[in-house]
A protein has these predicted regions:
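Catalytic histidine neighborhood in serine/cysteine hydrolases
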Residues: 123-144
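Helix-rich cap/lid subdomain of alpha/beta-hydrolase
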Residues: 22, 32-68
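Conserved alpha/beta-hydrolase "acid-adjacent" motif
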Residues: 112-118
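Active-site nucleophile elbow and catalytic-triad environment of alpha/beta-hydrolase enzymes
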Residues: 77-95
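Catalytic active-site module of serine/aspartate enzymes centered on a nucleophile-bearing elbow/loop
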Residues: 138-170
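Conserved hydrophobic packing residues within short motifs/helices of P-loop NTPase cores
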Residues: 14, 104-106, 135
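Primarily recognizes the serine-hydrolase "nucleophile elbow" in alpha/beta-hydrolase
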Residues: 1-36
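Short beta-strand/loop motif that positions the catalytic acidic residue
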Residues: 99-100, 105-107, 111
Length: 170
């Protein structure tokens, strides 16, 4: 979506799944008080506190350990603080008005990874897209989890049908 905001040769973009703030995603796996502490420590560049706190939490939470390990691997960073510095650049805030293409937003209602509020926030902040299609998959249809784990074909079918609609009319 960031690319689509700046590259007008892109005529359609799919957010599978939505993600408008990477830092928020990677701190939402923590309890509220810990999340607030990490946000405050990050604003004060307290790398030692962040690394210590996340290190302790990773020992207690498989999800937090996986999320941080995977994130540091993908971003080629060595510490949680470096990872958070990298993530702070992964935001769509202020870029939504630059999305003028056809846009498809996908999310799962029970996503364990990306807070559902990001789906609603992004949906509410895209005003200049040629078209905006939003799909929140449910548990009942088997698509309520992150990237529709358990029913990938539901998402794939939705994307393919949407692409047929978009490119069939342009």
């Amino acid at each position: 979506m960031r690319c689509a905001a700046f590259e007008k040769r892109i005529t359609a973009t799919v957010a599978y799944d939505v993600l408008d703030d990477g830092f928020e995603v990677m701190t939402s796996v923590f309890p509220a008080l810990v999340c607030k502490t990490i946000w405050t420590a990050f604003r004060h560049h307290s790398s030692g506190l962040i690394n210590l706190l996340t290190g302790r939490i990773r020992k207690k939470s498989i999800l937090a350990d996986w999320a941080l390990s995977q994130g540091m691997y993908i971003t080629v960073t060595q510490t949680p603080y470096e990872f958070y510095k990298n993530l702070s650049q992964h935001s769509l805030t202020g870029l939504e008005d630059h999305l003028t293409q056809d846009v498809l937003l996908l999310a799962g209602e029970k996503d364990h990874y990306i807070p559902t509020n990001q789906y609603y926030r992004l949906k509410g902040n895209i005003h200049h897209a040629r078209s905006l299609t939003c799909r929140l998959f449910t548990e009942a249809e088997g698509g309520g989890q992150h990237c529709q784990i358990g029913n990938h074909m539901l998402a794939v079918d939705t994307i393919l049908k949407w692409l047929d609609q978009v490119y069939g009319t342009h």
